[in-house]
Every structure is written in C-alpha cells, then in structure tokens.
Amino acid sequence: LQSIDQRELVKATGAGFEQVRTTETITKDVARAYYRAQVERRPIVLNMPADFMWQEVEHVATVLDVFTAPGGVAEGNALDDAIGMIASARRPLILAGAGAVSAKDSLIKLADRLEAPLATTLKAKGLFNDHPYNMDIFGTLSTPAAYDIIAKSDCIVCFGSALHSFTTDQGKLMRNKRVIQVDIEPSAIGGSLHPDAALLADASLTAETILWWLNEAEIAPSGFTKELDSETLTVHPIGTNKTATGCINYVQSLEVLESAFPKDRILVTDGGRFMTEVWCRISAPDPQSFIVTANFGAIGQGLQESIGAAIADPDRPVVMFTGDGGFMMGGINEFNTAVRLGLNLTVIVANDSAYGAEHIQFLDRKMDPSLTTFDWPSFAEVATSLGGVGIQVTTIEELEAALVSLDGVKVPSLVELKLDPNDVPRMRI
C-alpha cells in the first residue's frame, strides 16, 4: 500500500516534507516540522512510518526557537522611482493581497494620506471592511462602481499580491496605468504582469517608508476619494428575476442570507458555478475568516475544511456554501462527522441539479445539457437523516421562514436552495 515516492508527491503540491527518521528522533523531527512551517510559511507534511505507531518512546518536549526579524526595508533607486510615481499620480489606488494582511493599519494610513481608495484580492477579502473608501475585491469580481474607479485610476500600488489573471482581468485592468508591486517573496514579483516599479520588501515597512517621504516632501493628497460615492463602492446589482416556477432566485437568496447570518462568522466556499456570487455578495469579517477551498480547481473540499474551521474556532458560526455536485462528492459523507462533533455549522447547498460549470458550456455550444443534469435525492432529508436539521426552500418566503426556524438550533443545519439551472449567474472568472 502507498508504495509511491511520498516525498516527491508532497513536493509537487508546494508543501514541504519532513521525515520522522527513528523512534529516538521523533520529538526532534516533529519540532523541526513545526519550525519549518513557521519559517517557510507553508504547510509541512510530517511523514511517519506506520511501524513507529505502537513503539514506546520517552517523551521529551522539544521546541526549536524561531528566529524572526522584520522584513526587508525598501531603499535605493527602486524606492525613489516608486515614490516618484506615487507622488505624481492624480488617481492612485491601493491594492492589498493575502501577503499584506498584517500590514492593514499601515496601508490605511497611506491610503488616507494619498486620498486613495482601497481594494483587495480575493484572498484578502474583508481586510478593509470598515473603511469608507473600501472597494472590496479588485478584478473580475469587482462591482460596477469599482470597475469605474479602476478605469479612472492612473497608478495602482500593489502590496502582497502576485497579480494573477483574475485580479488583473487578463491584464486589461492594468493597461495605461503605472503599477508598483511590493512583496517580500521574489517569485511574486513580475510573474503574471511586469510592474513599472518593484520593491522586494515588507508591506508594512514599505507603506510607512513611502508615507514618511510623502510627508517629508510635502506632497499634496490626490483628492481622488473626493470624486467617489462611498455608498456604491461595494454594491452589486441584483438583476432581473428569470427563475422558473418551483425554484428560488439565487442572487436574491444570497442577499437574504447576507442579512440573516451573524456578521462575526467564518465563511467557507466549496467549488462550483455558484461560488463567485458568494464571494461577491456574502461578507466575511476579515481575511482570516474567509476560506476558499477551490485552490486546485477541485470541488468537494468545503465541508471538510468547514469542520476544521469550526473546531479551531468553536465560538463563532461557520457558514459553508456548496453546490450539489460538490456536496455529493465530498460533503454528504462528512455531514454526520459535523453532527457527531456538535459543530456550529450551517451548510447552504446551491442545488441546480446539475454540474453547473459543464451545464453552461453545453448551452454556450448549443448542445443538449441533459448530460450534465441529475435527479439528486433531497439533500435536506439526507441532512436530517444524518442527525442534523435540513430544510429545502423554493421561494424567498420559505427561505426567510427556514432561517427563523433554525435560530437556536444546536446541531448542524442544511438549507437546500432549489435553483433553476438556467438562471444561475455565470462565474465571474
């Protein structure tokens, strides 16, 4: 069994690999794995031979000190060039990615000094929620108002973002603008888009350095935010309801769910056609409370990661959105695990009775989509039979009533949205 090169398999995923060598070195090997995870800032797989499992060893607590130092400070001609571009910009914009989450306060100070709006990549969703000029997600998931602002901007200062094709909309959003990229990881700079200036440095320290020089040179604020209507920056239009009878409108459902769930929550999304509307319309309080499970483009990972999130933070509700295909693949067999653990978990199944990503492709090619459709069992009934509470809804009124009835429920719950496969919005990617 498992007679493959496990080290090479793990390395191919981007994770690190640490081998437990002998029973005598177990505590050191485990400590080494924890050390590497902190220093390398990536998952480390600890590989232990099965025949070690029942051997008795003397436990000796081993902790390796992690030597940390502030990240690099920007300097030299590259810094001068970047500051010159920022100082001369009429409509600057600050973009933060997952690599700049810890720099939140410094980025806000810089944005306020420049009078520049703030935006995030998908993985940094929620970072600037409370700021009046928060544009939310930058890229193909932007609101119409945010798209207009991006179009008007002349300088985009990017912190902790690799600027991949979804963020830049295949590069179109960055055309005719000066792009400054700040990242501590060399591989993140210029990988997808070549910037006009690049600073291999810590995001927070760089923002503070730029701010200091702007003040030192008495550079006037841009005034860009004075042109903006802060009320519209994060508003996505609802659109026309074309949903067939017997089904619930998906976008309207999300608007109801956004208002109904506690704001201090953990948001998890599985993969599928449904997910991009969730990313746009369902908020998370901060990036650490937002879990995207489709990193490999694979569906069926959502419930497993939701269980982990609920165990890690039992004092907050976890809300997980999944499609019907993803729930059948990896959710239905784990729902009872959530029940047995008594987790504070609500699962929303966007059930369009189809593999939605394929359904739209068949329609686009004027082919019969019936091959992509399925007559699933009732997910609500299955959830109830597994020890939870399941409710299927086909109207907004039924959804609102279901949410009221679930208030105070002490077991995992599931709300099945019965959707029209012909009226689920296209993925915004």
Predicted region positions:
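Short glycine-rich anion-binding loops that position phosphate/pyrophosphate groups of nucleotides
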Residues: 50-51, 98-100, 124, 161-164, ...
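Glycine/aspartate-rich loop-and-adjacent alpha/beta segment that forms the canonical ThDP
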Residues: 8, 52-75, 282, 381, ...
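Active-site diphosphate/adenylate-binding microenvironment
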Residues: 229-315
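Gly-rich Lys/Arg/Thr-decorated short loops/hinges at beta-loop-alpha junctions or inter-strand turns
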Residues: 9-13, 56-68, 129-130, 230-241, ...
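Thiamine diphosphate
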Residues: 94, 146, 152-155, 160-164, ...
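A general structural motif
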Residues: 68-81, 100, 139-142, 247-249, ...
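Acidic, Ser/Thr-rich peripheral helices and adjacent loops at domain boundaries
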Residues: 360-377
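N-terminal alpha/beta PP-like core and its mobile active-site loop of ThDP/TPP-dependent enzymes
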Residues: 1-217, 256, 263, 344-347, ...
